[in-house]
Amino acid sequence: MVVIRKTSVMRSSFIGIYAKAWDDVAFITKMADEKTVNEFREVLQVDIKRISIDGSTLIGTMIAVNSNGIVLPYGSNIDGLDGIDGRNVLYLKDKINAVGNDIIANDHGAIIHKAFSNKARKEIEDTLGVETIRTSIGNILTVGSASVLTSKGMLVNPETDDDELEFLKDFFKVSVKSGTANFGSIYVGASIVANSKGILVGRDTTPIEIDRIDDVLS
C-alpha cells in the first residue's frame, strides 16, 4: 500500500522545490531537519541523500532523475552526491539550468522545456536513456514544476486538455490525471515529492486534493 502524508520542508508547503525522489533514492536539502529527513525515508522507503548544490537549498529545482541517470546544472558544486554508482550523470551546459523545473521523466520518456537546445536534448536523452521531446504541459513550459511523475502515475496541472492527457498516458505509459495541491496551486511538482512507494504532499493540500493525488499516483 502506498503511503501518503502531509508535510513541510523548512516550514514551506512547497516541498518539491527542496527535494526530488525516484524509486531507489531521494535527494533533499542539507538544511532539512532530522525529523523531516526521517519522514521522507519512512514514506518513500529509499535511501535519502542530503545534498546542497552551489550552497542552494532548492534541490528539487535542479535535479532530474530516473533509473538510468541524473541531470544536474553545469559547473555546479555538489556536496553529498555519493553512492549513486551505476547511473549516468550529466552536468548539462545550456542557457536553462533549473533542470528540475524544466525536465519531467520516468523510465519510458522525458519531456523538457521547449527552449533547450538540440544538443541539450540529445544529451538528456542519452543520460536518461529514454525518448526525449520538447513541449509544454498544460501551456506551462516549466514542465517539472507543474507535474509529478512516477513509475505508476502522473499528475498534471488543470489546464492540460484531454488530448494532452491521452498523449502523456501513451508516452509515459502510466495513468494521468489533472489536479492541484497546496489549496489550489497548479504547480504540483513544487508541491509534491513522490515515488512508486510513497507520496509526500505540502501541508496546505486539502483532503479533496489528496484523494485525487492518491488515486493517480498510487
Curated annotation (Swiss-Prot):
GO BP annotations listed: cytosolic ribosome assembly
SUPFAM superfamilies reported in the protein's UniProt record: Pentein (SSF55909)
UniProt-listed SMART domains: eIF6
Gene Ontology MF terms: ribosome binding; translation initiation factor activity
UniProtKB keywords: Initiation factor, Protein biosynthesis
Keyword Protein biosynthesis: yes
Keyword Protein biosynthesis: yes
Pfam families linked to this entry: eIF-6
Similarity section: Belongs to the eIF-6 family.
Reported function: Binds to the 50S ribosomal subunit and prevents its association with the 30S ribosomal subunit to form the 70S initiation complex.
Protein name: Translation initiation factor 6
Species this chain originates from: Thermoplasma volcanium (strain ATCC 51530 / DSM 4299 / JCM 9571 / NBRC 15438 / GSS1)
Gene giving rise to this polypeptide: eif6
